[in-house]
């Protein structure tokens, strides 16, 4: 069993019921972000699943230089602070440099380390020194057993508020696969593990100037991951994925979330009997 991590009023790991980290890929604007958060809260309250709201203020690794990146750190954190205050929900976003750590930590309940940056020692240590909960996305290039070294960098700061997230492994060009063995391997570090169900079905750079995705496989992989014992599920959602400014092809439609979460909750209940 992993240690229990507390994020606001949400508890992850330690045998607790499945938690959800969800929200749009990127903050498109204040109105849409608040509307998405309100809808997710309503859905999660109805199903009985705890929510951490996620949204990126800057998508710093978009495929094309012309792709929409978000409102930037200052405006994005303002919007996330408003979501947190209005709904009482914990909030999560990515940090990309040491300079972002301190201002982000003033607002965010969880500092997320992007997959491409998961081995950057200075960033991990700076994040760890805040004492905040740190969610590290496992790089697409990293073996699951290598995450113990990532954990060691953060825990060296006397910070054990660590969550690890599986988001698929590179499989040739423009493709990812999920190795279900990674869940027990990563959980053997003693920290909770979350499955990023939507980035795992991404086709990186698969559309030339943007990434593609296979949304139709999100449910299948999510069900398998919950059956394998993950502590939480990470999903990017959107009212109209076809109109999303980032990662639409692999985002889940908000209308589809209630039925999906009910299935995942039922599987989790069986696993944790």
From Swiss-Prot:
PANTHER family associated with the record: PHOSPHO-2-DEHYDRO-3-DEOXYHEPTONATE ALDOLASE
Catalytic activity, reaction form: D-arabinose 5-phosphate + phosphoenolpyruvate + H2O = 3-deoxy-alpha-D-manno-2-octulosonate-8-phosphate + phosphate
Enzyme Commission no: 2.5.1.55
Q: Which GO terms describe its biological process?
A: keto-3-deoxy-D-manno-octulosonic acid biosynthetic process
Q: What class of enzyme is it?
A: transferase
Q: Which UniProt keywords apply?
A: Cytoplasm, Lipopolysaccharide biosynthesis, Transferase
Family statement drawn from the similarity comment of this UniProt entry: Belongs to the KdsA family.
| Annotated Gene3D superfamilies | Aldolase class I (3.20.20.70)
Q: Where in the cell is it found?
A: Cytoplasm
The UniProt entry, under Pfam families, shows: DAHP_synth_1
Alphabetically, the GO molecular function entries are:
3-deoxy-8-phosphooctulonate synthase activity
- Pathway where it operates: Carbohydrate biosynthesis; 3-deoxy-D-manno-octulosonate biosynthesis; 3-deoxy-D-manno-octulosonate from D-ribulose 5-phosphate: step 2/3; Bacterial outer membrane biogenesis; lipopolysaccharide biosynthesis
Looking up InterPro entries in the UniProt record yields: Aldolase_TIM, DAHP1/KDSA, KDO8P_synthase
Q: What is this protein called?
A: 2-dehydro-3-deoxyphosphooctonate aldolase
Task: Tell me a GO cellular component.
Answer: cytoplasm
Under the heading NCBIfam families, the entry gives: KDO8P_synth (TIGR01362), PRK05198.1 (NF003543)
Q: Quote the SUPFAM superfamilies the UniProt record gives.
A: Aldolase (SSF51569)
Q: What is the name of the gene encoding this protein?
A: kdsA
Organism's domain of life? Bacteria
